[in-house]
């Protein structure tokens, strides 16, 4: 017998829900209904009375996304970074999920890479066997070994924002948060198109900003993924799809970084510490300041520090 959960909410939330489920709307609406939507393992029906019914195996998980919105009092409340209606259901770790993660945002040298990966629930034991976990806990050699196997196991989409383009977009008023949002959305969109007609049970983004801010960044985009999209900090510990995305993003970043070092004709350090300032100063001396945008993220404080070292 399938689960059935009813929540009481308001017209604003129902309109938001209709927007979220717009790609899953059913042409049929029951009497007194506003809309009916069908997502994997759950049917959602919203009524003019303000009641919303969730039916199916994932009724509880789907309803939990909206209960906090409906029950929050109008007085301002301070929410934790993970407290929002896009929080993943408790069972997400065993679901078939698209996960996305980015690498390179804190490195002065090198590009920003974003990868989206689809992991079918049946593949989870295999990924564990391959040693898939957060890339921050793996060295470059381990990343390479695991990534080379992953490339043949999971569907993925990989994007690289090279330094020159990064600096150009940043100069046009796009902060790093917006650039990350654009890349995550694009990688996920590309992967979903590649996977079609297979649909994941959900999409999990390794959270780098509040979901509402994420969607504001995407306001002018033609294609924005909203259906069953969840956000969680430390996403790699929530689902292996994010951990796999983290590894492939790191693998891509390391490859690009090595190519950049060859182009520079000198080893380039990662991160944004003092050794980076010294290396940047040497690079300016070697190639000239006009070549710097090819290698670095110019808005970092390291740029000014490198020029100071040359005085």
From Swiss-Prot:
Q: Does the keyword Lipid metabolism apply?
A: no
The EC class name is hydrolase
Give the enzyme's EC designation: 3.1.26.4
Where in or outside the cell it occurs: the entry states: Cytoplasm
Stretches assigned to the RNase H type-2 domain: 95-311
Which is a Gene Ontology cellular component entry for this protein? ribonuclease H2 complex
Cofactor entry = Mn(2+); Mg(2+)
Alphabetically, which GO biological process terms does the record hold? DNA replication, removal of RNA primer; mismatch repair
Which key words are in the record? Cytoplasm, Endonuclease, Hydrolase, Magnesium, Metal-binding, Nuclease
Cofactor-binding details, from the entry: Manganese or magnesium. Binds 1 divalent metal ion per monomer in the absence of substrate. May bind a second metal ion after substrate binding.
- What InterPro entries has UniProt attached to this entry? RNase_HII/HIII, RNase_HII/HIII_dom, RNase_HIII, RNase_HIII_N, RNaseH-like_sf, RNaseH_sf, TBP_dom_sf
What Gene Ontology terms describe what this protein does at the molecular function level?
Answer: magnesium ion binding; RNA binding; RNA-DNA hybrid ribonuclease activity
UniProt-annotated binding residues for a divalent metal cation: 101-102, 206
Q: Which Pfam families match?
A: DUF3378 (PF11858), RNase_HII (PF01351)
Q: Which CDD domains match?
A: RNase_HII_bacteria_HIII_like, RNAse_HIII_N
Q: Does the keyword Magnesium apply?
A: yes
Q: Which reaction(s) does the protein catalyse, per the Swiss-Prot or TrEMBL entry?
A: Endonucleolytic cleavage to 5'-phosphomonoester
Q: What does this gene product do?
A: Endonuclease that specifically degrades the RNA of RNA-DNA hybrids.
Q: Which family does it belong to?
A: Belongs to the RNase HII family. RnhC subfamily.
From the Swiss-Prot or TrEMBL record, give the protein name.
Answer: Ribonuclease HIII
Give the organism the record lists.
Bacillus cereus (strain AH187)
């Amino acid at each position: 017998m399938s689960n059935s959960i009813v929540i009481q909410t308001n017209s604003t939330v129902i309109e938001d829900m209709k927007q979220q489920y717009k790609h899953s709307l059913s042409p049929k609406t029951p009497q007194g209904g506003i809309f009916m939507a069908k997502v994997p393992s759950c049917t959602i029906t919203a009524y003019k009375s303000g009641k919303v019914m969730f039916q199916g195996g994932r009724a509880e998980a789907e309803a939990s996304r909206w209960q906090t919105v409906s029950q929050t009092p109008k007085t301002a409340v301070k929410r934790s970074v993970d407290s929002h209606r896009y929080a993943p259901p408790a069972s997400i770790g065993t679901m078939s999920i698209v996960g996305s993660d980015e690498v390179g945002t804190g490195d002065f040298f090198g590009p920003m890479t974003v990868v989206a990966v689809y992991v079918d629930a049946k593949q989870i034991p295999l990924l564990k066997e391959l040693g898939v976990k957060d890339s921050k806990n793996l060295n470059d050699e381990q990343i390479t070994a695991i990534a080379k196997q992953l490339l043949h196991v999971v569907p993925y989409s990989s994007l690289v924002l090279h330094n020159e383009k990064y600096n150009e977009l940043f100069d046009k008023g796009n902060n790093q948060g917006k650039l990350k949002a654009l890349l995550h959305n694009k990688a996920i969109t590309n992967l979903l198109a590649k996977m079609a007609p297979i649909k994941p049970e959900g999409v999990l983004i390794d959270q780098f900003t509040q979901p509402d801010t994420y969607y504001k960044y995407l306001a002018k985009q033609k294609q924005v993924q909203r259906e069953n999209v969840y956000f969680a900090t430390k996403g790699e510990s929530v689902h292996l799809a994010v951990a796999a995305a983290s590894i492939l993003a790191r693998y891509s970043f390391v490859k690009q970084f090595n190519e950049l070092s060859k182009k520079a004709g000198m080893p380039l350090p990662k991160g944004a510490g003092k050794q980076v300032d010294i290396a940047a100063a040497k690079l300016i001396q070697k190639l000239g300041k006009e070549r710097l945008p090819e290698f670095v993220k110019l808005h970092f404080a390291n740029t000014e520090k490198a020029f100071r070292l040359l005085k």
